[in-house]
Amino acid sequence: MARYRCCRSQSRSRCCRRRRRCRRRRRRRCRARRRAMRCCRRRYRLRCRRY
């Protein structure tokens, strides 16, 4: 429904529903289905982890 994007403004790397763009060079969307997830970069890819 609402796609999560990697927002560096909130606690470095965190997934949020807001439409704020990522300040990083490459825009990558996080594949998050739940609210409580963090963005982690693995092998040049951003993934979400539960915390």
From Swiss-Prot:
One Gene Ontology term, aspect cellular component: nucleus
Compartments reported by the entry: Nucleus; Chromosome
Molecular function as annotated in GO: DNA binding
Annotated PROSITE patterns: PROTAMINE_P1
GO biological process, one term: sperm DNA condensation
Coiled-coil positions: none
UniProt superkingdom: Eukaryota
Protein name: Sperm protamine P1
Classification of source organism: Eukaryota, Metazoa, Chordata, Craniata, Vertebrata
UniProt key word Nucleus: yes
Role, per record: Protamines substitute for histones in the chromatin of sperm during the haploid phase of spermatogenesis. They compact sperm DNA into a highly condensed, stable and inactive complex.
